[in-house]
C-alpha cells in the first residue's frame, strides 16, 4: 500500500485496513491504545455473526499495525479464502458494516487482483479511472463506497491532488469532503448487489449432510465446528506421504463410527464429494455398494476421517495445553466475555449447560484466532487443537449413538447439478440483469423490430474509435439507437474522393510541370485539375458499375438478395458522357440494386441460428452492441403455439 499501492499479496487472500480519521495529533502509544480498544469493540460487536461462521481457510481478524512510511498506524487483517470466494464478499460486508457503525473509521479492501471492488463495477466506472491511477482512491466510509476523483485539466480544485493521493491525503479528503467523493449510484449498486442478503445469506450457503463418523470426530465438531474446514482441506490437498498415516488409523478407529449430522459450507461439501477416493484396505474404512441407501454417508464419513487423521498425524500426541490457557489469561478475555453476554451471544442458555459450554468453546477459539493472536511459535495447529479437545473433553460413545435416532433430515444436494436455465439465470444475476418475464415473450416476438440489427451495426461502424479500441454501449437495453445518415454518407464520400482536398505539398507532381507560369495559368491549371478529378471519379464509378454487372451473373452475385423492381421496364438513362460507357458492357441485362440491410440481417440471423443457442460470433457481436434477438419461434413449439 505504500507508494504506488501495488502489493505482493498472497494468492486467494483479501487484505483490509481500517484507519481512524485524523482529528488531532497523538503520540504513538496513545494511538496504539485507541486502536486496540477499537479492535476489541469491533470484534465483540460483530461476534454474533463472526463466531458461528465456517471459514474456508482463515477467519476474519484484526490487529494493530504501526505507522510505516507514509501510512499511519491502523487496524489490519488478512484472510486466505482459498476456493470459497464467498468468504471474501462476506468480509466486504463486515467491513462495510463496521464503517457504518463507526463513522470515524475509513476502510479499504483489496486482494491479489488489486481493487477488486472496481472490477465488480467495471461496467459503470468513469473513463478516467484505470488501474494506473486508482491507487489510494477507493475506500468505505459511513457504509458507502467512496472514490476520490481526478481533477479535470480545465479546472483546478485545491483539495484534489493531480497525482494519486497518499493515504494521509486520502483520509483528509474523505474527512473534509465526504459527499464529494461518494461513488455514483450505479457503482454503489453493483457492489451492494454482491453483498446483499447478508447476514441471512450465510445460512443459505450451508449444507447439512449425514456422515458415518468416528465418535471422536463427532465430539470434536460439537466443540469446534470450524475444524471441519481444516479436515476437508487436509483430505482435499493430501499427498502420498499424508496417506501413509491412514494405512492404519491410530486416533479415529473405524469401530467407533456412528451416524451424525454435519454442517458444511457448500464449497466444502462440493470439495469433499467431487473427489473419487478408494481407502486402503488396511484402514478398516470399507464402503457399502453404491446402491446402498447410506452409501453417501459412509463415503463422506470415510473422507472426513482421513482428513482428521492426517491433521493429527502431523503433531505429537504428548504436548502441553498451556497455550490454550493463554486465552483466559489474557486481560482482554474478561471484557470480551462480558461484551458477549451483553450482546446475547449465549441466547439465554444456562451457565454450565452442555450447549453453553459449546458456545463458550467457540468463543474462546474465536478470541484466540481473531483477537488474542499469539505469536506463531505459540499458536496451536489444527491437529493439536483436535487432540486437546479429545484429551480435555470426555465423551460417551453410547450417549452419542443414542442421538442417531433424532438426526435432522439432510439437505438436498441437487444444487451441485446446474441445468442450462439455472446457469443462464446465474449469469444474468452476476451481470445485474433483471429476471426475464416469461409472460410477455409472445408479445416481445410480435413487437420485435428486425431493423434494429442493421441500425445498430451502422451506428457502431460510423463512430470514430480511440487508440484504445471501439467503445461498446454501456446499457444498450435502455439507450435508444441513434443513426446520422448524413454523417454516414459523408464518411463514404470521403473514402471515394467525392470532395478532394486541395494540397499545398511540394511533392505534387503538377507543380513540377508548370514551374514558371503566371497566375492566369495557375487558375487554368486548377480548373483543369478539377475536371481531371471529376473524370477520374466518373471512371471509377463506371468501373465499379461494370464490375457489378459482371458479378451479377455469377454465383456470388446471385447469392445476394436484391430489391424488387417496381417498374419492370428498362430504366431510362439521362444523357451524360458516361451513359454509353456504362451500358456498353451490360447488354440488355439490368443489374438490380443489392438490399444491403436485408442481406446483413439475413446473414446474421443465419449465423445466429446455426449456433443452436450456444455462444458464437453472431450473438457475441450483437450482444456487445446491445441487440438481443428473441428465441427462434420456428423451433420452439411452445412459443409458436
UniProtKB/Swiss-Prot annotation:
Its main location: cytoplasm. The modification Phosphoserine is found at residues 503, 505, 519. Keywords: Activator, Cytoplasm, mRNA processing, mRNA splicing, Nucleus, Phosphoprotein, Transcription, Transcription regulation. The gene is Ecd. Belongs to the ECD family. The keyword Thylakoid does not apply. Residues 561-571 have a biased composition (Basic and acidic residues). PANTHER family: PROTEIN ECDYSONELESS HOMOLOG, SGT1 PROTEIN HSGT1 SUPPRESSOR OF GCR2. InterPro entries: Ecd. This is Protein ecdysoneless homolog. GO terms for biological process: fibroblast proliferation; mRNA processing; positive regulation of transcription by RNA polymerase II; regulation of G1/S transition of mitotic cell cycle; RNA splicing. Interacts with TP53, MDM2, TXNIP. Interacts (phosphorylated) with PIH1D1. Interacts with RUVBL1 mediating the PIH1D1-independent association with the R2TP complex. Interacts with RB1, RBL1 and RBL2; ECD competes with E2F1 for binding to hypophospshorylated RB1. Interacts with EP300. Interacts with DDX39A.
Amino acid at each position: 500500500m505504500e507508494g504506488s499501492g501495488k502489493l505482493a499479496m498472497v494468492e486467494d487472500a483479501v487484505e483490509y485496513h481500517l484507519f481512524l480519521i485524523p482529528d488531532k495529533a497523538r503520540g504513538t502509544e496513545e494511538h496504539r491504545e485507541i486502536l486496540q480498544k477499537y479492535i476489541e469493540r469491533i470484534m465483540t460487536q460483530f461476534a454474533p455473526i463472526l463466531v458461528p461462521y465456517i471459514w474456508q481457510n482463515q477467519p476474519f481478524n484484526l490487529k494493530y499495525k504501526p505507522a510505516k512510511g507514509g501510512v499511519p498506524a491502523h487496524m489490519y487483517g488478512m484472510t486466505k479464502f482459498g476456493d470459497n470466494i464467498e468468504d471474501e464478499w462476506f468480509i466486504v460486508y463486515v467491513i462495510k458494516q463496521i464503517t457504518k457503525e463507526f463513522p470515524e473509521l475509513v476502510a479499504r479492501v483489496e486482494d491479489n487482483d488489486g481493487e477488486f471492488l472496481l472490477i465488480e463495477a467495471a461496467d459503470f466506472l468513469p473513463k478516467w479511472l484505470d488501474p494506473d491511477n486508482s491507487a489510494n482512491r477507493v475506500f468505505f466510509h459511513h457504509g458507502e463506497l467512496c472514490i476520490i476523483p481526478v481533477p479535470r485539466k480545465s479546472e483546478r480544485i485545491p483539495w484534489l491532488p493531480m497525482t494519486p493521493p497518499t493515504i494521509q491525503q486520502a483520509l483528509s479528503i474523505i474527512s473534509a469532503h465526504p459527499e464529494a467523493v461518494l461513488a455514483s449510484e450505479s457503482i454503489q449498486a453493483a457492489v451492494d448487489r454482491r453483498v446483499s442478503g447478508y447476514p441471512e445469506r450465510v445460512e443459505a450457503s450451508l449444507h447439512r449432510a449425514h456422515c458415518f463418523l468416528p465418535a471422536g470426530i463427532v465430539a470434536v465438531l460439537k466443540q469446534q465446528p470450524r475444524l471441519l474446514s481444516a479436515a476437508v482441506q487436509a483430505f482435499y490437498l493430501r499427498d502420498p506421504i499424508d496417506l501413509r498415516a491412514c494405512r492404519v488409523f491410530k486416533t479415529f478407529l473405524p469401530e467407533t463410527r456412528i451416524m451424525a449430522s454435519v454442517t458444511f459450507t457448500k464449497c466444502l461439501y462440493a470439495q469433499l464429494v467431487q473427489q473419487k477416493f478408494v481407502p486402503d484396505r488396511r484402514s478398516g474404512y470399507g464402503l457399502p455398494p453404491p446402491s446402498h441407501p447410506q452409501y453417501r454417508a459412509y463415503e463422506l464419513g470415510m473422507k472426513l476421517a482421513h482428513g482428521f487423521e492426517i491433521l493429527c498425524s502431523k503433531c505429537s500426541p504428548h504436548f502441553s495445553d498451556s497455550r490454550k490457557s493463554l486465552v483466559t489469561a489474557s486481560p482482554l478475555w474478561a471484557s470480551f466475555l462480558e461484551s458477549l453476554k451483553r450482546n446475547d451471544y449465549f441466547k439465554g442458555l444456562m451457565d454450565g449447560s452442555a450447549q453453553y459450554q459449546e458456545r463458550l468453546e467457540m468463543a474462546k477459539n474465536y478470541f484466540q484466532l481473531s483477537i488474542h493472536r499469539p505469536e506463531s511459535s505459540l499458536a496451536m495447529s489444527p491437529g493439536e487443537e483436535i487432540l486437546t479437545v479429545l484429551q480435555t473433553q470426555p465423551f460417551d460413545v453410547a450417549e452419542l449413538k443414542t442421538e442417531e435416532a433424532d438426526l435432522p433430515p439432510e439437505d438436498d444436494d441437487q444444487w451441485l447439478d446446474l441445468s442450462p436455465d439455472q446457469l443462464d439465470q446465474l449469469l444474468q444475476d452476476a451481470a445485474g440483469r433483471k429476471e426475464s418475464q416469461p409472460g410477455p415473450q409472445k408479445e416481445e416476438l410480435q413487437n420485435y423490430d428486425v431493423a434494429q440489427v442493421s441500425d445498430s451495426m451502422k451506428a457502431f461502424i460510423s463512430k470514430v474509435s480511440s487508440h484504445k479500441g471501439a467503445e461498446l454501449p454501456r446499457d444498450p437495453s435502455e439507450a435508444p439507437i441513434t443513426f446520422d445518415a448524413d454523417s454516414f454518407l459523408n464518411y463514404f464520400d470521403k473514402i471515394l474522393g467525392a470532395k478532394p482536398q486541395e494540397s499545398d505539398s511540394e511533392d505534387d507532381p503538377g507543380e513540377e510541370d508548370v514551374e514558371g507560369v503566371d497566375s492566369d495559368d495557375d487558375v487554368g491549371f486548377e480548373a483543369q485539375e478539377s475536371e481531371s478529378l471529376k473524370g477520374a471519379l466518373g471512371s471509377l464509378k463506371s468501373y465499379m458499375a461494370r464490375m457489378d454487372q459482371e458479378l451479377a451473373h455469377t454465383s456470388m452475385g446471385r447469392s445476394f438478395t436484391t430489391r424488387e423492381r417496381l417498374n419492370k421496364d428498362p430504366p431510362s438513362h439521362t444523357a451524360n458522357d458516361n451513359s454509353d460507357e456504362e451500358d456498353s458492357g451490360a447488354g440488355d441485362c439490368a443489374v438490380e440494386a443489392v438490399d444491403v440491410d436485408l442481406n446483413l440481417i439475413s446473414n446474421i440471423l443465419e449465423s445466429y441460428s446455426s449456433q443452436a443457442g450456444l455462444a458464437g460470433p453472431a450473438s457475441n457481436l450483437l450482444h456487445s452492441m446491445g441487440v438481443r434477438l428473441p428465441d427462434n419461434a420456428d423451433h420452439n413449439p411452445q412459443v409458436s403455439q
